[in-house]
């Protein structure tokens, strides 16, 4: 089997991830709910995960990191906690439904939303950000990298635009956290949402968000916090402000271990390997007859994703053939990002997405490219 569906979830985790989770299950209590060793051990696990993520993302402190069940919950927390009826939000057609559906709900409640479009290659039309600005514009939310095309958003441009006009910038880093260097302070990001089970190498059921110090938002969920139990309102200090109830401590043990492994290897080195594998695959298939590749490959700095179609062949059928005949795991369909498919004309066909990890080998990539070329030749 060749696993090239890493944009959905990374399959191969470092051994330390499972070991950390097993240790938690055998020795940890409930963090913040006592003073005995098992609960203190759990608290140390949670803090370790915060600390490693703060280091990876160059956050001001571990307290800037709040945990959720996934990036979808993190994005809901940010958007629903910051946007009010009458506010205007600027976003893009590249977004995942984890951004779109919260915005649609907020629109039903009185918010307004504008969508920056893409050109025929899938690249954002950055001039439209200024075009869509209104007196009531409050927030900009963008994906760091499209989960469909792999194209990166120019965060330096978007951040400068947001800062110029006093807007809050929320970034969906589902495809980039752990896969490339990110410095939230240098980028001027106000909120950065991440998932644990992709490039951060943690287990499913983990995620969270970085929140810039001084930025406050209404919590999505309130309840048990382990502190200030006689107060009628949920605690307002970070990270407790955005965390209600018992955290997924086994998952956070694995996430902390995964991020620590990334830091030990160097995120720059891992990113360079993924970039090289992606470029190798692209160069081997770019001239295959009838193969249409989506996204811009003029620049090598992009997410490790190559999405394509074989002529008019249904993407789901092509993915089935890749699995059944070649043992290659890929993702086909709309990838939960409907607007980019509308923009690129692939609503009915979908796309076949290959996504790479530093865990993949050059031999695997070459075999996958060979399979693509064979299928293309067969027509």
Task: Please report, for each region that a protein language model flagged, where it lies by residue.
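Pyridoxal 5′-phosphate
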Residues: 1-379
